[in-house]
């Protein structure tokens, strides 16, 4: 495993690889915005990132990705109903 990666055993059948110093030019603004990357799907022509962030992190992410061609699918928690 590269020196910038660390493996963590989750169970006897699953392990996670943590990246200490990420060099991906798209991942850096995501991380700098305060969001947490939970996964990425890589295909021939696109990356689909799964991230978790709060409202402030989401706004910062949009600002950080200015100039980057991206499509966004937002899945949010609906506001709590008051009676």
Curated annotation (Swiss-Prot):
Q: What is this protein called?
A: Uncharacterized protein AF_1847
């Amino acid at each position: 495993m590269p020196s910038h990666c660390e493996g963590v055993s989750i169970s006897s059948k699953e392990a996670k690889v943590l990246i200490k110093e990420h060099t991906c030019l798209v991942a850096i603004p995501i991380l700098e915005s305060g969001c947490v990357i939970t996964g990425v799907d890589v295909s021939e022509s696109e990356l689909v990132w799964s991230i978790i962030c709060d409202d402030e992190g989401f706004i910062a992410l949009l600002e950080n990705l200015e100039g980057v061609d991206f499509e966004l699918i937002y899945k949010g928690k609906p506001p709590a109903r008051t009676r």
